[in-house]
Regions:
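A cross-kingdom feature that marks ATP-driven nucleic-acid transaction machinery
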Residues: 3, 12-25, 31, 36-43, ...
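Short glycine-rich substrate-engagement loop in P-loop NTPases that contacts/grips substrate
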Residues: 45-72
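Conserved Walker B
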Residues: 50, 80-84, 110
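Conserved ATPase-coupling elements of RecA-like P-loop NTPase cores
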Residues: 56-57, 82-91, 116-117
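Conserved P-loop NTPase "ATPase switch" module shared by AAA+ and STAND
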Residues: 70-87
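Conserved catalytic/switch belt of AAA+ P-loop NTPases
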Residues: 88-112, 119-120
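Short regulatory helix/loop adjacent to the ATP-binding pocket of P-loop NTPases
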Residues: 112-128, 143-144
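Interdomain hinge/linker elements that couple catalytic modules in large macromolecular machines
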Residues: 132-306, 318-319
């Protein structure tokens, strides 16, 4: 069983009288994480809110009912908590009633209803974590696995790192097809009020095709037949269900910097490729640069999240097409990174960026130098 980076951090939050909330896409390993957290705990109460009967136990309860349900449990595990009506109030009631006597851990695959409802009703009672598909660091940390991960790099760029894909690589495509046809959009369709799933699928395909490029809501609207506001709404839903994420353009000084541009990336390369139905090896692909960029950016953001870093992430581009793939800013320090799949391809800091940010650092990340960037 692959150990998740956030497990130890979650355990360190036990006994503080707070609800631990773990958000992440379906099938990234949240239930497995709950099982790991339950190891060596004598009295555990498990509630799976995908099950209607179990969900009913948390529908409009009073404090006495909650205390009777918990009984003498030391650990209360609530899976897929976003399906509980008024989930924030329920978690608040549990936290207030139990205090540090029992630890509550709730998971959810959607930030749509869960995070918003929780933070409105249970302010000050939540420690939040995000769980993503397996990270490069988690995979490389397995005993003797670092060289194995280097050898499997091309496979990761094509098939990604959902746990089941990693543990059953021969079935990778079939597993990803199953995720894409079922779990991927389940929460978007449930909570987003979307009546035309085919239009949503078309939008995701358009985002997949524009990987590594700036996206325009107007252009996406023309490609899908949606208006700009609906495109923006759907992208927001996809971000809140952990299918994609955005990077905004970095701009501080120069007049010609793009100030409102953004790129859309996928949290998992395999999901991006299954959306397009393309699992060709890298040697037969024309999108290697985009896959490399998506993998590095998503893996870097996983690392920052698990390290609980406050660094902010961007890309940089000017109206004259000078560009840098990835920018990080923390406490006034700016780090710039350029991504090159070919380790022999040269790159240097663009002169306009160097002039505008003379104290910034600049690094080139290739397939021979990425470990330090991700671990």
């Amino acid at each position: 069983m692959i150990k998740r980076d956030i497990e130890a951090k979650i355990r360190s939050d036990f006994g503080k009288g707070k609800v631990v909330l773990v958000l992440g896409a379906r099938q990234v390993g949240k239930t497995t994480l709950l099982n790991q957290l339950a190891e060596n705990v004598e009295r555990v109460l498990r509630i799976n809110c995908d099950n209607a009967d179990e969900r009913e136990r948390l529908s409009n309860p009073n404090t006495t009912q909650l205390l009777n349900m918990v009984g003498n449990a030391q650990l209360v595990l609530i899976d897929e908590a976003q399906r509980i009506p008024d989930v924030g109030m329920v978690l608040k009631m549990l936290a207030d009633a139990l205090g540090a006597r029992a630890q509550i851990v709730a998971t959810g695959s959607s930030a749509l209803e869960l995070a918003n409802g929780v933070f409105e009703s249970a302010a000050g009672r939540i420690f939040e974590y995000r769980l993503y598909p397996l990270s490069h660091g988690e995979l490389a940390a397995q005993s003797g696995a670092e060289r194995t991960e280097q050898r499997l790099l091309q496979e990761r760029l094509v098939y990604g790192s959902y746990p089941e894909v990693v543990t059953a690589p021969n079935d990778g495509r079939r597993i990803l097809e199953s995720i894409a046809s079922g779990a991927l959009y389940k929460d978007v369709l449930s909570f987003g009020g979307i009546r035309k799933p085919d239009v949503l699928s078309r939008l995701v395909q358009c985002l997949a095709l524009q990987l590594g490029s700036e996206v325009s809501a107007n252009e996406l609207g023309q490609m899908t037949g949606l208006n700009k506001a609906t495109v923006e709404s759907y992208i927001d839903l996809l971000e809140k269900t952990f299918v994609v994420f955005s990077l905004r353009s970095f701009a501080r000084n120069a007049r010609n910097e793009l100030k409102r541009a953004r790129k859309i990336y996928f949290w998992d390369n395999g999901i991006r490729n299954v959306v397009l139905g393309n699992f060709a090896p890298l040697t037969l692909r024309t999108d290697v640069g985009a896959l490399w960029e998506n993998w590095l950016v998503s893996e870097r953001l996983k690392r920052l999240a698990y390290a609980q870093s406050y660094a902010r992430s961007y890309f940089w581009r000017t109206t004259t097409q000078s560009e840098i793939d990835y920018i990080e800013e923390l406490d006034g320090q700016i780090k710039a990174f350029e991504f090159k799949w070919n380790p022999h391809e040269k790159a240097k800091m663009p002169q306009p960026f160097a002039a505008a940010y003379p104290n910034a650092t600049y690094s080139v990340i290739s397939r021979e130098s990425y470990d330090g960037f991700l671990m």
